[in-house]
């Protein structure tokens, strides 16, 4: 089984914010793979289906970003999945807007959602797709920036990044993640 989680915050208020790009990617995967997000359990919204012969679980934690591990640990336990079965999609301030980077492990890098996951999983070793949202300018506070909407100029870059994320997730169904990582990171 493959568990793909997109991190974000629940509710209309946060729907199109930079911090919710993980949710945006899950929504796109849901459409692309025809997996309806129709179950709520473990403080998450999720759906299951088969893609390229593999069982896939798409998850949007509803715990708010900073508590994402409180949703994903119980889901992994319930479905008898391990951290090696998990792919996490989330926003990254340290990447330029619209760029993606894949990683097989690493620190939280200041991202509280990832910090929560590492804490609840007991390991930093899980696959990640980081989507760049850039850094705030003109003295804007980070919290205001990540909870702000994408500008008209940023939107096409984010849409492109979400499309690339879908392609990377699709590739990871049939290839080892390390190979997918090398392929997609080379094209960044």
From Swiss-Prot:
The keyword Hydrolase applies. GO terms for cellular component: cytoplasm. The active site is at residue 19. It is found in: Cytoplasm. The record marks 91 as: Stabilizes the basic form of H active site to accept a proton. The record marks 9 as: Discriminates between blocked and unblocked aminoacyl-tRNA. Keywords: Cytoplasm, Hydrolase, RNA-binding, tRNA-binding. Belongs to the PTH family. Hydrolyzes ribosome-free peptidyl-tRNAs (with 1 or more amino acids incorporated), which drop off the ribosome during protein synthesis, or as a result of ribosome stalling. This is Peptidyl-tRNA hydrolase. It comes from Bacillus velezensis (strain DSM 23117 / BGSC 10A6 / LMG 26770 / FZB42) (Bacillus amyloliquefaciens subsp. plantarum). The gene is pth.
């Amino acid at each position: 089984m493959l568990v793909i989680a997109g991190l974000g915050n629940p509710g209309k208020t946060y729907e199109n914010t930079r911090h919710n790009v993980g949710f945006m990617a899950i929504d796109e995967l849901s459409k692309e793979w025809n997996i309806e997000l129709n179950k709520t359990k473990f403080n998450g919204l999720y759906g299951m289906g088969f893609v390229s012969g593999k069982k896939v679980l798409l998850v949007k934690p509803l715990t708010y970003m900073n508590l994402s591990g409180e949703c994903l640990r119980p889901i992994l336990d319930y479905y008898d999945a391990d951290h090696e079965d998990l792919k996490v999609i989330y926003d990254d301030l340290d990447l330029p807007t619209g760029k993606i980077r894949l990683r097989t492990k690493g620190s939280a890098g200041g991202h509280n959602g990832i910090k929560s996951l590492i804490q609840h999983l007991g390991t930093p070793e899980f696959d990640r797709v980081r989507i760049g949202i850039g850094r705030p300018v003109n003295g804007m506070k980070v919290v205001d920036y990540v909870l702000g909407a994408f500008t008209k100029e940023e939107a096409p870059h984010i849409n492109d990044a979400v499309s690339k994320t879908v392609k990377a997730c699709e590739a990871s169904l049939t290839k080892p993640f390390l190979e997918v990582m090398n392929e997609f990171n080379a094209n960044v």
